[in-house]
Regions:
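Short beta-strand element of the alpha/beta-hydrolase
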Residues: 58-67
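Catalytic nucleophile-loop/oxyanion-hole region of alpha/beta-hydrolase
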Residues: 74-76, 80-81, 94-130, 267-272
Length: 294
């Protein structure tokens, strides 16, 4: 009987977890075909999955940008999972499904810029403040988040499209084992090739190396990586942190000694599981997340 009850509880928990991973709704990033669309398949239509909390006391939202080396979008472990983590803690979360190879720059970046503008314009609809919208990127998604943080603008007031009137600048960024640089000595070769092609334009390499574009106006950052990462070198994170320090941008940095690439939330990988506790504390200190109920 005890074994049966245990199995029943396990099955119920599995069903509940599956139910929680279904977004409340999905938004199209563009009203029609995306600029430069190569077809009409799902991969040609950028979308945003919406995860809303039961209550949002700090009126905060986060655009979650999964990784995948610009060749795929790791939408479960680096998309739905962190979105649920945020929603469970009273923060609205939005998972971006952006275009990847064969699409190249500027498509993935443009999709994220448009998503930020779209969400900021819908802040009241989703119960968050337009000045409390962050971006959380993993791996190549971290590169996109870092570009949003460094090359954003305040909107295009003259545009006939009202979505373009809003800023695409995140109010804070969370960078998890991110690609930061497109320079060959630091960057992730596959991400660079998928985004810029086999023979990248040096001007695009320079433009998309985020470490060279931070200013005092760049948003606060939380950066997490591991020293052992043999896919995206930890130097990427260190370059971004050093650039934040030079520019006077608030930054919190955690590098664990051991851990492979792509650990996502690392819930079952001690001591790496501590990184989300550190993130939670950082968000609470900055009033982007309410303190946990005692």
């Amino acid at each position: 009987m005890r074994l049966f009850a245990s199995l029943l509880l396990s099955a119920f928990s599995s069903v509940l977890l599956h139910a929680q991973s279904v977004p409340a709704r999905t938004l199209n990033v563009y009203p029609g075909a995306a600029p430069g669309a190569l077809g009409h398949a799902d991969a040609d239509r950028p979308t945003i999955d919406v995860y809303l909390p039961a209550a949002n006391p700090t009126h905060t939202a986060v655009l979650v940008i999964p990784g995948g080396g610009y060749s795929k979008v790791v939408a479960d472990r680096e998309g739905a999972a962190p979105a649920e983590w945020l929603a469970q803690r009273g923060v609205a979360a939005f998972v971006l499904h952006y275009r990847v190879a064969p699409y190249r720059y500027p498509a993935p970046i443009a999709d994220a810029e448009r998503a930020m503008r779209l969400l900021r314009g819908k802040a009241a609809d989703f119960g968050f403040s337009a000045d409390h919208l962050g971006a959380w990127g993993f791996s190549a998604g971290g590169h996109i988040a870092s570009i949003l943080a460094t090359l954003s603008d305040n909107g295009v007031p003259a545009s006939p499209d009202p979505v373009e009137h809003a800023s695409d600048r995140p109010d804070f960024v969370i960078l998890a084992y991110p690609v930061i640089s497109m320079k060959p000595q630091f960057g992730h070769a596959d991400s660079r090739q998928h985004l810029l092609g086999p023979m990248p334009d040096p001007a695009q390499v320079a433009l998309l190396s985020a470490e060279d574009h931070l200013t005092a106006a760049s948003p606060p950052a939380f950066v997490f990586t591991t020293n052992d990462d043999d896919v995206v070198a930890s130097q990427n994170s260190m370059l971004y942190v050093a650039a934040c320090q030079r520019a006077g941008v608030p930054v919190e940095f955690h590098m664990f000694e051991h851990g492979h690439h792509g650990v996502d939330l690392a819930e079952h990988l001690p001591p790496l599981h501590l990184w989300t506790l550190l993130l939670e504390s950082w968000m609470q200190q900055n009033q982007w997340m309410a303190p946990a109920a005692q």
